[in-house]
């Protein structure tokens, strides 16, 4: 599986995720605005954080 791993509005980058079946896109707001984190897997998140997990290559941009 290949997942995007750039932060927020950085240019797209990807990484290979051997053994993982999900990519995630996690977003929340703080004093800097909306923060977006992307990566491999499907993490547990705290309330108030918007999480999307998906299962195809580069699906989490």
UniProtKB/Swiss-Prot annotation:
Gene3D superfamilies: CD59
Spans annotated as Disordered: 1-20
Tissue-level expression: Expressed by the venom gland.
GO CC aspect terms: extracellular region
GO MF, one example: ion channel regulator activity
Primary location: secreted
Alphabetical keyword list: Acetylcholine receptor inhibiting toxin, Disulfide bond, Ion channel impairing toxin, Neurotoxin, Postsynaptic neurotoxin, Secreted, Toxin
Location in or out of the cell: Secreted
Any single Pfam family the record assigns to this protein: Toxin_cobra-type
Composition skew (Polar residues), residue ranges: 1-16
Disulfide bridge partners, by residue number: 3-23, 17-40, 42-53, 54-59
Purpose of the protein: Binds to muscle nicotinic acetylcholine receptor (nAChR) and inhibit acetylcholine from binding to the receptor, thereby impairing neuromuscular transmission.
Similarity remark: Belongs to the three-finger toxin family. Short-chain subfamily. Type I alpha-neurotoxin sub-subfamily.
Protein name: Short neurotoxin 1
């Amino acid at each position: 599986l290949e997942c995007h791993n750039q932060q927020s509005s950085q240019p797209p980058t990807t990484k290979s995720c051997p053994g993982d079946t999900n990519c995630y896109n996690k977003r929340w707001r703080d004093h800097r605005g909306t923060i977006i984190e992307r990566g491999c897997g499907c993490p547990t998140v705290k309330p108030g954080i918007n999480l999307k997990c998906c299962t195809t290559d580069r699906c989490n941009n």
